[in-house]
Amino acid sequence: MAGGRYRAGVQQDRRTPAPAWRVTSGEPDPGTVERLLRSLPDWFGIESAVEGYVAAAARMPAYLAWPADASASANASEPTRTSQPPGISETAGTSEPANPSQPAGASEPADASQPAGALLAARHYPGAAEIYLMAVDPAWHRRGAGRALVAALEADLMADGVEFLQVKTLGPGYQDAGYERTRRFYAAVGFQPLEEIDGLWPGNPCLIMIKSLRGPRP
C-alpha cells in the first residue's frame, strides 16, 4: 500500500459548490474510521461488523479525504502531488450516493479539519486489489469525497502495476435504498457487476463489482 501521498482535485457539484479535496494515505487511523462508521447507521448498523472494520483499520493504511481549505493538515511535511479525479459509498465499499446533481443531504460540518471520508484497500495478488471499506461522513455526501478517494487509490495502484480493482457490496437481491445508491456510485466510477453470491454474508447477498485499471490497448 502506498504511503505518505497527497493529491488535490476540484470536484464540481451542479447545484452546491463542492470543495477541493486533499487525499492523504499512510498510517492506520482506526479512530477516524470508527467515527465515520458510527455516523452511517443505515449502512453500518451491525455492531459486530463495525468492531471488525475498526479492528482492521488498526492495521491497514488509510486513505483519508480532507476538505482542501481545512485549517488543519494530516501531515504538513508530506510530499505533494496533484491530480484532477474524473468527474463522479458501505460494506467493503462506501456510503456516498452517486448523483452529484442533487444537493448535499446535510449541512457542512462545523469542524472541517477532520477527514470527511476514509478508504481501506487490500492487495490479494500483485495484479489485483480490493476496496475493503469506504465511508464518507453523511454531511459531506454528494460533494466529491468518495470519488476523490477512489481516484487517489487507483492512481497508486496503477503506478504499482495493479490491473484489477474489486469491491463487494450488498447485492440487489436484497432491497435497500441506501445500498442501491452505493451500487450506483460504483457504477458511476467505472465498476461493473460481476456476480451476486450467497453465503459470504449469511442472509445477505454479496455483489462483486470489478474495474479494469489497464489503459486502452494499442
Predicted regions and their residues:
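A short, internal acetyl-CoA/4′-phosphopantetheine-binding micro-motif in the GNAT/acyltransferase core
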Residues: 134-142, 171-173
